[in-house]
Amino acid sequence: MTKFLAGAAIVLAVAFGSFFSQSSTVTPPAPRYLPNDWDSTCTISKSGAYEVYSGDNSFSTSSADHLSALKIHPNINSTNWEQWEFDGSSQTGLSSVLLVFSRDPSYSFFGQGNLRIEFYIALPDGKRVEVLDYLEESTVVHCPGRYTAGMWNSTDRSYSFRIDDNMKNAQLSFDSAKIHGKFNVTSDTSSALADGTLWTGKDDRKGVSELSPGLFYAVPIPGGFVQMDATLESGKRLVFKGKGGSTRLWAKAGWLNLCGGWKNIRGWAGPYTVVYWELISRINKGVKYTTGLLFRDGELLVGTRNGNISQTEDYTVFEDLYGGEVKGSFADQSTGHNLKFVSPDQEKEWSFDIEHMHSFVEFRAPGEDEYGNKGLGQSGFTNRVSGGEVGEDRAYEGRGITEKCRWPKEFGKLALAIASGAGFFGPKFQMIFIKVVSYLV
């Protein structure tokens, strides 16, 4: 079975071709290639598609370490992984982008290697672009005081990012047959840790980087202005301005071992920026872990990992909403959410309604979770966000994105064989198959 699936995955690999050339409206311009100005002060990690480090490697748990820098060095081993994530949506909410750079050995089972790019785009006409790509090599460079830069590349395609060390600007560039262009994020908020406190880089406080057992989380750019300028395979050009941010995740085990599902939100409404993660642990079975950030005009109002009502500590309250127009195809039929931030010390409460507008990614995950639930999978939406401080004279409106999923506990061999066979029917089925399985081990 293993040999069959690995062979099938190789046959299903997506072939990429020529590049597009198009002048860009994004400023400042993103670098097409990695900077060549590194020196002896820089940390450099280069990895081939199938490389894993033999033995124990350096795995960062310190809250003092730079959020964008390498968390695993000199390279991932057979169990741990890390990723850099960037996202944004347009002012209208009709367009969005989610781009994830991963070093992750959990899908090497399929012969595709360890270097994954996930690229999901919502288009104004309601269509979407879903790219799952595996690259031949990646290089990540961190030069203290200057930048972190990364490139995932093969002979005929590449994806790169560069983040200033003050984490105020991220520049992304991508060249492939599917999409060619640039995406920039300019922060108007301060970087934060999993416990909701702001990152200073000066002290190591135990446990504040860990979102749930085994999973570490940080928010280099909670919110900021984004610019997208890209040309699609069809020749269509996608240009928009809006808001978005970036997230860092690194972990000691694969997703299915760590959690049964999650929901995450990034959005804005008027002067407010909201970021929220909710995760159901499988290490501590069924325990819910949360983290939330609320900014106004770039200043942190509430930062907390407390998801329970309290008379003394700041907390969040998250609730799914139903009855709207846009929902996923799976058991989770929610059409949005309500997210509250409460601060007993400030004697204030803020409430935001988050309504799904448009789907940017969706796929089904066959199987059951540990509670016998079926209809599992992952969905992503652009959102309409409205709200503000409870008791204020006005409510603000903005946009954002949601990603939500529920994972099966395991996939039987028959289900995997069916999914593998489905890949022969086209790139969309192939993408669904490999994407789902990439989280299994």
Swiss-Prot record:
Give the glycosylated residues.
77, 153, 184, 308
Pfam families documented for this protein: DA_C, DA_N
What family does this belong to?
Belongs to the Diels-Alderase family.
Per UniProt, the keywords (alphabetical) are: Glycoprotein, Isomerase, Signal, Virulence
Where are the disulfide bridges? none
Pathway named in the protein's UniProt entry: Mycotoxin biosynthesis
Q: According to the entry, what is the taxonomic lineage of the organism?
A: Eukaryota, Fungi, Dikarya, Ascomycota, Pezizomycotina
Has keyword Isomerase?
yes
Q: What does this protein do?
A: Hexane cyclase; part of the gene cluster that mediates the biosynthesis of GKK1032, fungal natural products containing a macrocyclic para-cyclophane connected to a decahydrofluorene ring system that show potent antitumor activities. Within the pathway, gkaB functions synergistically with gkaX and gkaZ to form the cyclophane. The pathway begins with the PKS-NRPS gkaA which, with the help of the trans-enoyl reductase gkaC, synthesizes the polyketide-tyrosyl acyl thioester product which can be reductively off-loaded by the terminal reductase (R) domain in gkaA.
Give this protein's Gene Ontology molecular function annotations: isomerase activity
This one is known as Hexane cyclase gkaB
Signal peptide start-end: 1-25
Q: What EC number(s) has UniProt assigned to this enzyme? A: 5.5.1.-
Q: Report the enzyme's class at the first EC level.
A: isomerase
**InterPro entries from the xrefs?**
DA_C
